[in-house]
Amino acid sequence: DVYKRQLWDDANSHFSEVAHLAKKDANGGIVGIWGAMSDISRSFKPWEDGFSKGLYLAGVECVDNAEAPDGWIKWTIPSYEYIVVENHKGMFEETIGQMNEDGISLVGAVHDYTDPVTGKGYLYFPIREV
């Protein structure tokens, strides 16, 4: 969607402002690139109106004590147990459908994750608070 693409273009063009705050793995690589989501109330509940209305934050996973520089926002996502699926066209709807069939409730907003090493995208469906 155009709005998300604009957010990512903006985040990527200013990444140098937060690169030093990014969480790193043992090899010094960035741990994760996230499209974090929340409901409008910012309580990290699922998007409303058939998953069409909510907030989206394009960014990088940062060290816990990071303070967002000017122009950036820090979200601290609650801890959940997730169902994780590789992100392909139609996977969101397919996974929600399968969860409904299996009686599994979505307890928070779904997040986009991009593995910086492989470039593969994943969807994280929160199913239980931890």
Which residues does each predicted region cover?
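A solvent-exposed interaction/effector surface
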Residues: 1-130
